[in-house]
Each structure stands twice: as structure tokens, then as C-alpha cells.
């Protein structure tokens, strides 16, 4: 009996020592910190509520004092600037295209790209959305994609807006850098300012007078869409190249009345047949490999 007791005590002591040692394992302490509510939030994780410079509080003259009359004035002005409804922005990447020739005029959709656009149009039709605006990049491949989509949805082609700000480009040097794609620094300065201007033009909370949720369809390009996603969600903009989206895919972002932004779809292409899934220019049709 004494031997059994000694054995049991030794076993318990050994297990206790092992457990205490495991608790002090630095790797486990790091894992525990991920769920520790007392851990300070990183500055880069904090949400900027005035990201679009349209936070109602930023549009109203601040309180001068605590007088009831002044508070009534402030609250009355604030109410006039508060949005009531959400905005939905649906981004479509153009279909597969041929990169032949030196100008955009020769960059037409492939047969597969046209099929992709048709499926996307049918998918948008199935969603039953009533479109408030349709906007397209003025590059040929985006124009052709938009034209095919418009054959499938209920929207007057005469009301489509063509926007040069949405043209494809190099928005910002990516992190981590990649060896196969190194635009000149001047291209980032030129394209980056334009693409950022496009973001500010189309991404903002609703106007106070908007009485119903709105739906805006934008047909554009892979780099621009990925940059928009990072900016809208307040992720580091340099992370845009870590995201991959297929041709003719659907990305859906919602800007709530409060200004909070959420993503519903990111590069959704599950409605396309497997044989139509592509995300790069056909290798035999590229000017530069």
C-alpha cells in the first residue's frame, strides 16, 4: 500500500510539474493573449469613424457651452446631417481579355470573357436588385463587360456613366513586393492619385436625404477593386496584391448609415462553370510574360 501511495504521489507531482511548465510556455502565452480582452488594441486596428469626412459630428459647429439653448442648436443641426439608409456598392471585374497591341483599343474580351460577363449579368438579374446607378471604367474590356451585363439586368444603357478614374493602374507599392511586377515609381504617383480619387468619389456614407437603401454597380478592374476593398475596410492599402479575384467576379461592400463598412462578397465567382474560372491574361496572348 505504501508503495502504491508513493507511486501515486510521484505521478501527481510529475504531472503537476509538467502542467506548470506548459503554462509557462511562451508560445502558449502568446496564444492566450489573442483572446485576452485586457490586451490593448493596436492603433492600426481602431476604426476611423470619419474615414469619408462625412461623420455628422464633423459637419456641425461644436458646442460653445452647456446652455440648453446651445445644446438644442447643436442637436438640431446634427440631426440634419445624419444619414438614414445604407449604400450597397457592387464591384464587377471585367471578363478575360486579350493583351495584344500597344493601346487599350485592341484589348478586347476573349470568347471566354464574353461568356463570363453573360453569366455575371444573369447572376445579378437573379439577385433581383433595383439599380440606382451603373458606372463603368472607360477601358475597352470594362466597357464590353458592362455592355454584356446590361443585356441581362433591368437598367437603361443610356444612363450608364463612364469614368476614367476607374481605369486600371498601379494604386500603391504592394507589401510584400513581388518580383514579376515592378512598375516605375512614377506610375504609382500617377495612378495612385487617380485611383484614390475614384475611391473618394464613390465610397462614402449616404446623404441625409436618401430615403431608401441604394445600389450602385461599378464595372472595373482587378487592381482597383482590390485597392477599394482594403481602403473601405481600413486594412493597410499596401495589402491589395495579397488578394486575388477572378474575372467577372462580384465584390459587394455595404456602407451603413453609421458609416461602418462590411463586405458581403469578395470576388464571388461560384456561379461560373469551372471551365470559365480565370484570373489572368491568357499566356499565349500577353505582350509581356
From Swiss-Prot:
Record has Lipoprotein as a keyword: no
Catalytic activity as recorded in UniProt: O-phospho-L-seryl-[protein] + H2O = L-seryl-[protein] + phosphate; O-phospho-L-threonyl-[protein] + H2O = L-threonyl-[protein] + phosphate
Top-level lineage group: Eukaryota
EC number(s) from the headed UniProt entry: 3.1.3.16
Any one Gene Ontology BP term: positive regulation of mitochondrial fission
GO MF assignments: phosphoprotein phosphatase activity; protein serine/threonine phosphatase activity
Gene Ontology cellular-component annotations: mitochondrial outer membrane
UniProt cross-references to CDD domains, sorted A to Z: HP_PGM_like (cd07067)
Localization terms from the record: Mitochondrion outer membrane
Keyword tags: Hydrolase, Membrane, Mitochondrion, Mitochondrion outer membrane
One Pfam family per UniProt: His_Phos_1
InterPro entries named in the record: His_Pase_superF_clade-1 (IPR013078), His_PPase_superfam (IPR029033), Mito_Ser/Thr_phosphatase (IPR051021)
Family: Belongs to the phosphoglycerate mutase family. BPG-dependent PGAM subfamily.
Task of the protein: Displays phosphatase activity for serine/threonine residues, and dephosphorylates and activates Pk92B kinase. Has apparently no phosphoglycerate mutase activity.
Subunit record text: Interacts with Pk92B/ASK1.
Protein name in the entry: Serine/threonine-protein phosphatase Pgam5, mitochondrial
Lineage: Eukaryota, Metazoa, Ecdysozoa, Arthropoda, Hexapoda
Amino acid at each position: 500500500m505504501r508503495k502504491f501511495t508513493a507511486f501515486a504521489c510521484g505521478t501527481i507531482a510529475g504531472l503537476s510539474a509538467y502542467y506548470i511548465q506548459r503554462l509557462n510556455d511562451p508560445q502558449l502565452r502568446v496564444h492566450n493573449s489573442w483572446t485576452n480582452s485586457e490586451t490593448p488594441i493596436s492603433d492600426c486596428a481602431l476604426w476611423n469613424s470619419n474615414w469619408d469626412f462625412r461623420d455628422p459630428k464633423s459637419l456641425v459647429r461644436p458646442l460653445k457651452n452647456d446652455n440648453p439653448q446651445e445644446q438644442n442648436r447643436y442637436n438640431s443641426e446634427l440631426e440634419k446631417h445624419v444619414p438614414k439608409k445604407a449604400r450597397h456598392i457592387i464591384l464587377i471585374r471585367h471578363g478575360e481579355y486579350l493583351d495584344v497591341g500597344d493601346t487599350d483599343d485592341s484589348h478586347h474580351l476573349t470568347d471566354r470573357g464574353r461568356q463570363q460577363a453573360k453569366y455575371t449579368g444573369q447572376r445579378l438579374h437573379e439577385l433581383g436588385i433595383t439599380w440606382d446607378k451603373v458606372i463603368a471604367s472607360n477601358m475597352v474590356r470594362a466597357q464590353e463587360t458592362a455592355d454584356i451585363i446590361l443585356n441581362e439586368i433591368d437598367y437603361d444603357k443610356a444612363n450608364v456613366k463612364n469614368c476614367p478614374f476607374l481605369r486600371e493602374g498601379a494604386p500603391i507599392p504592394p507589401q510584400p513586393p513581388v518580383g514579376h511586377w515592378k512598375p516605375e515609381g512614377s506610375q504609382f504617383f500617377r495612378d495612385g492619385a487617380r485611383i484614390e480619387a475614384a475611391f473618394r468619389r464613390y465610397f462614402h456614407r449616404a446623404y441625409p436625404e436618401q430615403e431608401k437603401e441604394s445600389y450602385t454597380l461599378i464595372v472595373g478592374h482587378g487592381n482597383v477593386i482590390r485597392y477599394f476593398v482594403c481602403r473601405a475596410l481600413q486594412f493597410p492599402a499596401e495589402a491589395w496584391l495579397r488578394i486575388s479575384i477572378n474575372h467577372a467576379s462580384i465584390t459587394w461592400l455595404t456602407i451603413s448609415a453609421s458609416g461602418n463598412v462590411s463586405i458581403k462578397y469578395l470576388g464571388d465567382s461560384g456561379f461560373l462553370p469551372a471551365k470559365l474560372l480565370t484570373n489572368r491574361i491568357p499566356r499565349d496572348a500577353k505582350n509581356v510574360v
